[in-house]
């Protein structure tokens, strides 16, 4: 189960709330902050190396043999890679080709649209124009996945309840 969408749309908040609702699931936190801890530049400053590190993170998550709830997935990598100036064309081709091979590994996509302004936490981008472009790209990619996806809206608990209804 992959939680996807632009930054600052409530994914991590809902991810944390889902932990006590899905006790038999493994929870995998988002990758961007993880690779940033290794010193890779992130957000608009991301590079080919950043994106390949994030690719490794997402592919490793798919190797886990249990039910997963993911705060971001390979789709996020594809979307954000399309908006980076510092990424080589061959790396973007690799990411897109890999996406086409792994996208069916996800059983459920949960899409978080933009409903409120970005929160400046010192890590995520607060560039609203960039964020809106990212959101539109998510919508395009979601239309290309085989599985139907759920769009969640409202308060965090309303979103959790929508997910519970969708997953049962």
Predicted regions and their residues:
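Glycine-rich phosphate-binding loop used to anchor ATP phosphates in small-molecule kinases
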Residues: 52-103
